[in-house]
Amino acid sequence: PAPESSFIRDP
């Protein structure tokens, strides 16, 4: 899976 799953970005 992509690393983006490791952190959450605020809109």
Swiss-Prot record:
GO biological process: neuropeptide signaling pathway
Compartments where located: Secreted
Superkingdom in the source lineage: Eukaryota
Keywords of this entry: Neuropeptide, Secreted
Chief location: secreted
Any one GO cellular component localisation term in the record: extracellular region
Family: Belongs to the FARP (FMRF amide related peptide) family.
Functional note: FMRFamides and FMRFamide-like peptides are neuropeptides.
Protein name, as recorded: Extended FMRFamide-10
Species classification: Eukaryota, Metazoa, Ecdysozoa, Arthropoda, Hexapoda
